[in-house]
């Protein structure tokens, strides 16, 4: 790479950073950080633990953006300084290092832009993910279990913490339903891309004739809301609370007492199970939190539907649509039908390498919003 080309790249990156700076309002973010950190020094800060954690999470999110921008800004200055030195002194090792830095910087800038795409009102929240098999018994239940492992591996790679809140094993293999609580900054922002129906085509391990089978599983994802974010009043007369014995994922943590909780909300028909805690009280608290999140999400969707009707828009039912196909036979291919992102590395995808699909979806959403704007 010639120095003139390196300069063009640096100038392009500089221009991009300036554009981002204009939309980021860094000064306002830094002011907010100062305000949050002053709040954290207050002796009464931890009196309300949920509110305190909310402040800490918001502060960390702001610092993550500001620090990432400042780091990019500093790296770009260093690269330009090195380029200027190379104009005066021909040093091949220094030039190779600079070329590598320029290439690395592009990847860092792409990742930073991706981080900025997660600016929805609840993108920073934890996520509640539910997986359900389609028709087909053992075939689709096994496919649901494969998706469960895929998401567990992806979350592990992202540094997210995954709790299995509810797990109903399949009759012979796989899983009939599973609910995950995924905790981590931007968990919902990333995982919302997975909402929809996932299709598998393979030679069935359960078919002695070795025939090809197609299986389906649905993935639903909503944000987990904190009590500080929402106000949802639930009338005790509207719910029924039942207890049952926890089954446990893979037969683990099976309770001998009925500590698992099922809450049925009669006006909406929403049913929430929680069994990963050791006591009825904690399972009830967790189940109520999930129920409130679902009711609030329902409220948001109703408002969005009303606005869509006012604007005369036809809104597609998101989770009921097929979003991705995983073909194991007669060829190997995973393809996202929303973005046309595809790969032949099926094993890597099933081992959690779904980042490219999620990134492509987020970028397509950004492009769509820009076109609408």
Curated annotation (Swiss-Prot):
In the record, biological process GO terms are: viral translational frameshifting
User: Mind telling me which SUPFAM superfamilies this protein's record contains?
Assistant: Release factor (SSF75620)
Q: Which GO molecular function annotation, any one, does this entry have?
A: translation release factor activity, codon specific
**Pfam families from the UniProt entry:** PCRF, RF-1
How is the protein altered post-translationally, as described in the entry? Methylated by PrmC. Methylation increases the termination efficiency of RF2.
State the PROSITE patterns in the record: RF_PROK_I
Presence of keyword Amino-acid biosynthesis: no
SMART domains xref list = PCRF
Which keywords are on file for this protein? Cytoplasm, Methylation, Protein biosynthesis
- Modified positions (N5-methylglutamine) are 252
Which compartments is it annotated to reside in? Answer: Cytoplasm
GO cellular component terms given for this protein: cytoplasm
User: InterPro entries from the entry?
Assistant: PCRF, Pep_chain_release_fac_I, Pep_chain_release_fac_I_sf, PrfB
Further comment found in the protein's record = The gene for this protein contains a UGA in-frame termination codon after Leu-24; a naturally occurring frameshift enables complete translation of RF-2. This provides a mechanism for the protein to regulate its own production.
The role this protein plays is: Peptide chain release factor 2 directs the termination of translation in response to the peptide chain termination codons UGA and UAA.
Q: Which PANTHER family match?
A: CLASS I PEPTIDE CHAIN RELEASE FACTOR, PEPTIDE CHAIN RELEASE FACTOR 2
What family does the Swiss-Prot or TrEMBL record give for this protein? Belongs to the prokaryotic/mitochondrial release factor family.
Name recorded for this polypeptide: Peptide chain release factor 2
């Amino acid at each position: 790479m010639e120095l003139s080309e390196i300069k063009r790249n640096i100038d392009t990156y500089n221009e991009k950073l300036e554009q981002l700076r204009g939309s980021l309002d860094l000064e306002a973010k830094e002011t907010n950080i100062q305000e949050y950190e002053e709040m954290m020094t207050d002796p009464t800060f931890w009196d309300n633990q949920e509110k305190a954690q909310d402040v800490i999470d918001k502060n960390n999110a702001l610092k993550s953006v500001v620090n990432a921008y400042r780091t990019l800004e500093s790296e770009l200055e260093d690269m330009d300084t090195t380029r200027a030195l190379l104009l005066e002194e021909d040093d091949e090792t220094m030039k190779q290092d600079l070329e590598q830095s320029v290439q690395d910087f592009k990847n860092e800038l792409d990742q930073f832009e991706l981080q900025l795409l997660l600016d929805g009102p609840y993108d920073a929240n934890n996520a509640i993910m539910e997986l359900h098999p389609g028709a087909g018994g053992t075939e689709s239940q096994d496919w649901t279990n494969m998706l469960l492992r895929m998401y567990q591996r992806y979350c592990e790679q992202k540094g997210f913490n995954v709790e299995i809140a509810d797990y109903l094993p399949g009759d012979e293999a796989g899983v009939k339903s599973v609910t995950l609580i995924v905790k981590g900054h931007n968990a919902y922002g990333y995982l919302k891309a997975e909402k929809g129906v996932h299709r598998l085509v393979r030679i069935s391990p359960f078919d002695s004739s070795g025939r090809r089978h197609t299986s389906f599983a649905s993935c639903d994802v909503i944000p987990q809301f904190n009590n500080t974010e929402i106000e949802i009043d639930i009338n005790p007369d509207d719910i029924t609370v039942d207890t049952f014995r926890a089954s446990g994922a893979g037969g683990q943590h099976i309770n001998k007492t009925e500590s698992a909780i099922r809450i049925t909300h009669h006006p909406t028909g929403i049913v929430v199970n929680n069994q990963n805690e050791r006591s009825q009280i904690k399972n009830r608290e967790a189940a109520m939190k999930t129920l409130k999140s679902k009711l609030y999400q329902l409220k948001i969707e109703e408002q969005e539907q009303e606005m869509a009707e006012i604007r005369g828009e036809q809104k597609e039912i998101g989770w009921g649509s097929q979003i991705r196909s995983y073909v194991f036979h007669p060829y190997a291919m995973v393809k996202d039908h929303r973005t046309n992102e595809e790969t032949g590395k099926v094993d890597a995808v099933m081992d959690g390498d779904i980042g490219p699909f999620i990134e492509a979806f987020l970028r397509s959403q950004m492009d769509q919003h820009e076109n609408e704007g």
